[in-house]
Amino acid sequence: MSYVIRDAVPADLPAIREIYNDAVLNTLAIWNEQTVDLDNRQQWFDARQAQGYPILVIVDDADVALGYASFGDWRPFEGFRHTVEHSVYVHPDQRGKKLGPKLLAALIERARGCGKHVMVAAIEGGNAASIHVHKQLGFVTSGRMPQVGIKFGNWLDLTFMQLMLNPGALPPQERGQ
């Protein structure tokens, strides 16, 4: 089977919602406990589009989304405007097929193309597979916060990793850039 990574379109939102809701219900990849409806995903899609941020999907030969990736603002303050936090989710039937790393690699290139300087990953501390993938793609661990989250009745540690997208670049000199 071959895979293609492309920009998401509204027709992908049902598959994105299904993948997201599975992560909510069955994994520690996201610490939300409530599933979302299609309207929620549409609002999320529209907000990403309005900000000029990508949503990528990896699709099979039938053009069905098997995973998705996106990034958004790290924090809502001007001083962080060159730093983004990403998310990557893969359909449960497709995990272990290296789709996540492919999506993340494509997303990194998009962030570079957008002129971003740092990409942040916030990963559940016990997710060794995700931490390993991030290390393979050049991320370094920048911190660990013990017991800052809770899901499925357990305290969760948060590992922060970051990737310098354009090391050595000088900061923009114009105000507001």
Model feature map: region roles:
Residues A111-I123:
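Conserved GNAT acetyl-CoA-binding A-motif
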